[in-house]
A protein has these predicted regions:
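Flexible phosphate-sensing "switch/lid" loops adjacent to ATP/NTP-binding sites
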Residues: 5-25, 29-33, 37-218
């Protein structure tokens, strides 16, 4: 178990909002919808395109894969924001900081999304969604809302009435692994039409659409 805190963070103070880089957080409609792989694929794309990029793992699998990060669920709630803030501040010299997302604001069993939003003072968000999910995976009585409403929720919460950076959802990472190639293409096309955002499955089609969206939007 790698979920052992390596430092005792200070209480977060919003310092990350003063940084001049892009802080990209993957947020989700549920747990386990592809937030980690999306962040890693965008990070890889950024490096291949000569962008100075860093990746911050926030869960045990991400830490195991990359060899560093913060085990967010090992921190007491009041210190979780500070842990995220401290890691982001350490990456102040990187142009892009990809933060591995955790949980979902829609999930009643998740408390992880807000500390990452607040601690990183995120500037860009990628919404991650399973194409075959109409409800939460483990709470099937909870329907996933229209994704435009989910986008509005994350953007409103991130800015907190304008006192934090006005973070935008700049693209959607659609997990289509349960769909055949024809259904996957239709799902991507439908979401692009209904949200006016770039949509891709980063495993099936690559992350370029999302990387370009981050690059173009300040």
């Amino acid at each position: 178990d790698v979920r052992v805190p390596q430092f005792i963070p200070e209480i977060a103070s919003g310092k990350a909002a003063k940084l001049n880089n892009k802080r990209i957080l993957c947020v989700g409609t549920d747990m386990a919808v592809g937030k980690m792989i999306t962040s890693l694929e965008i990070h890889k794309w950024a490096i291949e395109n000569k962008i100075k990029s860093a990746f911050i793992a926030t869960g045990q699998i991400g830490i195991t894969v990359t060899g560093s990060g913060i085990p967010l669920d090992a921190y007491k709630v009041d210190y979780a924001c500070g842990a995220g803030e401290q890691m982001v501040l350490q990456k102040s010299n990187d142009d892009w900081v990809l933060i591995e997302g955790q949980g979902s604001l829609l999930n009643p069993g998740s408390t992880a999304s807000l500390p990452l939003i607040r601690g990183s003072c995120t500037t860009h968000m990628i919404l991650c969604h399973r194409a075959d999910f109409l409800t939460l995976r483990d709470s099937k009585h909870i329907k996933i809302p229209n994704l435009n409403e989910v986008i509005k929720l994350y953007e409103t919460l991130a800015s907190a009435c304008g006192i934090y950076p006005k973070a935008k959802v700049v693209g959607i990472s659609l997990n289509t692994f349960k769909l055949d190639s024809i259904a996957a293409k239709k799902a991507v096309d439908f979401l692009e039409s209904s949200t006016n955002l770039p949509v891709t499955d980063v495993v099936r089609y690559g992350p370029e659409k999302l990387g370009l969206a981050i690059k173009q939007i300040n």
